[in-house]
């Protein structure tokens, strides 16, 4: 599958970005994944997205001298080789991956339009969180996209044993600035950093062990 790699530094971490062309994907492209047989029943689009994410993950692991690839869990989540933590995200024809020595989550989202923000607001944030978003001075659709993405990143950084029953309401946006956000979950503060383009936002959450 044809793809292009870009390296994005953010908050001291290196995000591997893969822009890929799903039209060039062939099923045999999956053969380099040890578990490729388990993907045979997936749709072509999903297979291409999965491959792009694992390509990004391979580059991320290579940065720390790790040759093993993430395995795949029973919920299709990546299982990172010990002692590393990692995270993968997809949006359209782009995949991201990051590796760290501590729990980490990365997320990429397409920026909400004003109409989408109006429709989705109540399912993403509480009235108190809306106050925090409005206080940031950012355009509300951008701030809401960041809130959505931050909660996704926070979820990914949360230990797997605690993820099962979590929803957006469990993570509270308490602060947002021109480059950072803060979530609260179970009396713990989750620090995040973000960057944005005209079309997308990326958030990164790294926790202390």
Kindly label every feature range from the protein language model:
Residues 1-209:
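Core catalytic alpha/beta fold that binds nucleotide/phospho-ligands
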């Amino acid at each position: 599958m044809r793809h292009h790699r870009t390296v994005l530094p953010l908050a001291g971490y290196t995000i591997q970005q893969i822009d890929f062309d799903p039209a060039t994907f062939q099923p045999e492209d999956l053969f380099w994944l040890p578990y490729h047989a388990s993907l045979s029943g997936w749709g072509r689009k999903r297979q291409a997205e999965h491959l792009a994410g694992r390509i990004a993950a391979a580059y991320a692991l290579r940065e720390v001298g790790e040759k093993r690839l993430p395995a795949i869990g029973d919920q299709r989540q990546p299982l990172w080789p010990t002692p590393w933590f990692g995270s993968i995200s997809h949006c359209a024809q782009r995949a991201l991956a990051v590796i760290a020595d501590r729990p980490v989550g990365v997320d990429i989202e397409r920026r909400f339009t004003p109409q989408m923000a109006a429709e989705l607001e109540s399912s993403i944030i509480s009235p108190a969180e809306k106050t925090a978003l409005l206080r940031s001075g950012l355009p509300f659709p951008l701030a809401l996209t960041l809130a959505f993405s931050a909660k996704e990143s926070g979820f990914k950084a949360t230990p797997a044993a605690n993820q099962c029953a979590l929803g957006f309401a469990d993570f509270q946006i308490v602060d947002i600035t021109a480059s950072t956000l803060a979530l609260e979950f179970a009396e713990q503060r989750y620090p995040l950093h973000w960057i944005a383009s005209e079309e997308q936002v990326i958030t990164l959450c790294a926790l202390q062990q």
